[in-house]
From Swiss-Prot:
<dbReference type="Pfam" id="PF00475">
    <property type="entry name" value="IGPD"/>
</dbReference>
<dbReference type="InterPro" id="IPR038494">
    <property type="entry name" value="IGPD_sf"/>
</dbReference>
<keyword id="KW-0368">Histidine biosynthesis</keyword>
<protein>
    <recommendedName>
        <fullName>Imidazoleglycerol-phosphate dehydratase</fullName>
        <ecNumber>4.2.1.19</ecNumber>
    </recommendedName>
</protein>
<dbReference type="InterPro" id="IPR020565">
    <property type="entry name" value="ImidazoleglycerP_deHydtase_CS"/>
</dbReference>
<dbReference type="GO" id="GO:0005737">
    <property type="term" value="C:cytoplasm"/>
</dbReference>
<dbReference type="GO" id="GO:0000105">
    <property type="term" value="P:L-histidine biosynthetic process"/>
</dbReference>
<keyword id="KW-0028">Amino-acid biosynthesis</keyword>
<dbReference type="InterPro" id="IPR020568">
    <property type="entry name" value="Ribosomal_Su5_D2-typ_SF"/>
</dbReference>
<dbReference type="GO" id="GO:0004424">
    <property type="term" value="F:imidazoleglycerol-phosphate dehydratase activity"/>
</dbReference>
<dbReference type="InterPro" id="IPR000807">
    <property type="entry name" value="ImidazoleglycerolP_deHydtase"/>
</dbReference>
<comment type="similarity">
    <text>Belongs to the imidazoleglycerol-phosphate dehydratase family.</text>
</comment>
<comment type="pathway">
    <text>Amino-acid biosynthesis; L-histidine biosynthesis; L-histidine from 5-phospho-alpha-D-ribose 1-diphosphate: step 6/9.</text>
</comment>
<keyword id="KW-0456">Lyase</keyword>
<keyword id="KW-0963">Cytoplasm</keyword>
Amino acid sequence: MYTRKTLETEIAVELRRGGALQVETPIPFLTHMVETLLKYAGLGGSVAARELRRLDDGHHVIEDVAIALGRALDALLGERKGIARFGWAAVPMDDSFALAAVDLGGRPYWAVKAKLPDVSIGGYPLRMFPHFVRTLAAEAKATVHIYARGADPHHKVEAAHKALGLALRQAMAPGESPSTKGVLG
């Protein structure tokens, strides 16, 4: 289990391959997206987030959940031996379409291409989506690329989380952990 406590938040994340999943955050759309990401990644466990002091529009909760998720995923991956390493997925969702590609080779990088309006959905400012991905990628030591398009911003962001989850599932599947260097990272 990974825990993070700051003056603003208290986060606890436990991840495992498969099994039941429980996610609770003070931001309904964040809860929905984390559930979506982990379910499509084939991960079980729990994510519990509490906001101890409200300072802004949820920035600290969203960021700290991404930090904790990334660190818990990094711990779950361990030495990253025996995994496929790479994963990618395309997800259509009504009017929206998202692509995600990941490399779990231990080198953090992120790129998100998605035009999102400056609005909030369920307490989640959509401008935080790229920051969530960047933070998750950095803490998980993963390369993450996401492209999403569509008319409905909810569908666009949800399709992106589904695609990222499916890409993670593929990358975590048993495999050779290919590397021309002989080591990852």
